[in-house]
């Protein structure tokens, strides 16, 4: 029994370490990627060149944030303005993640969460938006069939673009 208990404790401790090492999303960014940083600062943070494809799309473009494609970074007018998270591997500071049920997000963010029907799918698809106290930043969850399918964070206006770059 002692061996089983020790094994279980090691397994749980190992899981906790993995969870603690994963980046978390806030109004201000994910890991080393910060809202408001320049494209050059983003290049340094990512360890690779940041350039739009095709080059004439420099006004607004997306860059993969990591090799696992768990998030992407929107650069508009030379600055990071929004980050789109598509993987459950990156939770918010409150613990919400892709794959969570709408009710779980409501419970985490409470009455401050603004709910709107999804632009394309309508109800039951929703946008659940949580604003910073000064309303400069937002965290927006996009849902499909009662489950978070993606979420965005960053400056309030770009987080509400339904098409990403305009």
Give the location of each predicted region:
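Generic hydrophobic-segment detector
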Residues: 4-6, 26, 85, 89, ...
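Bacterial N-terminal signal peptides
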Residues: 5-14
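Second-shell loop/turn segments in exported
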Residues: 26-33, 89-96
């Amino acid at each position: 029994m002692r061996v089983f208990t020790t094994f279980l404790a090691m397994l749980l401790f190992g899981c906790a370490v993995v969870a603690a090492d994963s980046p978390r999303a806030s109004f201000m960014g994910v890991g080393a990627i910060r809202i408001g940083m320049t494209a050059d600062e983003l290049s340094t943070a990512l360890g690779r060149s940041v350039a739009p494809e095709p080059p004439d799309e420099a006004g607004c473009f997306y860059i993969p944030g990591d090799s696992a494609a768990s998030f992407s970074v929107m650069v508009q007018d030379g600055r990071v303005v929004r980050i789109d998270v598509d993987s459950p591997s990156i939770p918010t500071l409150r613990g919400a993640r892709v794959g969570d049920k709408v009710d779980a997000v409501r419970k985490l963010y409470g009455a401050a969460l603004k709910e709107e029907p999804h632009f394309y799918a309508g109800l039951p698809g929703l946008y659940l938006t949580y604003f910073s106290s000064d309303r400069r930043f937002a965290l927006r969850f996009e849902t499909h069939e009662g489950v978070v399918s993606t979420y965005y964070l960053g400056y309030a206006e770009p987080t509400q673009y339904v098409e990403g770059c305009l």
